[in-house]
Each structure stands twice: as C-alpha cells, then as structure tokens.
Amino acid sequence: MPTYRDQAVVLRTHKLGEADRIVSMLSREHGKIRAVARGIRRTSSKFGARLDPFNLVDLQLVQGRNLDVVAQVECLHPYSAPLRQDYSLFTAAEVMVEAADHLVPVDREPAPAQYRLLAGALRVLGQGTTDGPRPPEMVLDSYLLRSLSASGYAPDLVDCVRCGTPGPHQGFSPSLGGVVCINCQPPGTPHPHEETISYLRALLVGDWTATRDVAWSRVREGSGLVAAFVSWHMDRGLRSMPLLER
C-alpha cells in the first residue's frame, strides 16, 4: 500500500473497537485527514500521547480505501499538555480545533492557510506572541477572525459593509458582516466603542503590538462581537463556544 508523510495538527479522536482510535487531523499538504491509530488505547502503544488533540505532529501514513492508517508519528510540539492544565487555554483551543474542522469541511482538500493559522494560534496560545503573552480570549478572537477571513468571510471593519460609505462608523452588524453606516443599520444594531473596532482590526491582521495596551473592557466587548459574527457565518455554530468564560 502507498505511504506518505505530512505534518498535521490533531483535531480530535474517536474510539474504534477495543484498542484503536480514529484520529482527525488538519495537515499541511493534504488538508483534513482521518486515520486509524491501531492499538493506541493499549498501555504498551508506541504512539503514547503523541496523537492527543492540539499536538503538532510529523507522521507517516498508509493510504487505505476508506481510512488511512498511522504508521509512524513524531510529536513536533506537544501543545496538548500545557493547554490542558489551564481551563481558559483548553476551552480556547477546543473552539479553535472545532472551527478548523468546520472551515475545512472536505477531507483531503489542501487548506494550507487554515493549517498555518491553526498551528500558529495554538503556538501563540501556549507560548505567547513575539510581543509577549496575550489573554486566551484575544488569541482565540484573532484566530476566529483570520480563519473566517481565509474562508471568504472577512468582516469589513472600515467602510459600511452594505453601501460602502467610507468609515469610521459606529454600528456593527454581525449578520451583515461588519460595520454599517447610520443609514444602513438594521434595528437593534450594537454600537461598540471606536477603540473596540480598532482593536478588532488589529486582531484581523495579527498586529500583536497594537493590542499591547488594550483595555480589558475593549477585549470583552470585542469578544462579544466576534462570537456573534461567528454564530452568523458558521452554518452549524460551534458547540464548544458556550464553554468559554466570556
């Protein structure tokens, strides 16, 4: 049977039979992969904890008719252990991998941008940014905005998303997909602080330096807007979102 190698982030695992697991991964070159890790639930398994969710791994797989089979695996970055030790980090990581699973709906369809965003977000979540550590809420919201943007759902945070009138604008409509002018605002449109919109723009482009001195009230307000935006633009929503301590 043909084999291949790839690097991947482990998204989730499911029990299979008495000793095996099906491992879902987002890979660098092959998109989303589902593969069987045989004997992984035995104490003598050669895989150990290397295929735990959130880990970044290098692996060799054997192509199968329905599911591939994991032949070898090396853990490049064991993100799982530190993220599981802190509830806020763990729940943020859970939302990230669930979002990645939704945004790459088809197996074996290359999604290099989504892979890079997820791997980078998990690294920042566990190790901090080049400008120092950031709260998990901030890292998660940046990932959600950027991954949705890579899938074609980028929010417009400058000009009116409906008519194109140049900003700045006070209204933000999650359903329309961004800021709206006073003439285009649907009933009940929230009016976040202008610093919150500027903060979201920084998250969207990954400008961590610009987030250094953001007030916590702006972070919390931004998280609410991102959560509403995600619920509108992901068809099934994210089941892990209610676990977040927002």
From Swiss-Prot:
InterPro entries the record matches: ARFGAP/RecO, DNA_rep/recomb_RecO_N, NA-bd_OB-fold, RecO, RecO_C
Origin: domain of life: Bacteria
Keyword Kinase: no
GO BP field: DNA recombination; double-strand break repair
Keywords assigned by UniProt, alphabetized: DNA damage, DNA recombination, DNA repair
A Pfam family annotated for this UniProt entry: RecO_C
Assigned GO CC terms: bacterial nucleoid
Family as reported in the entry's similarity comment: Belongs to the RecO family.
NCBIfam families (alphabetical): reco
Biological function: Involved in DNA repair and RecF pathway recombination.
UniProt-recorded name of the protein: DNA repair protein RecO
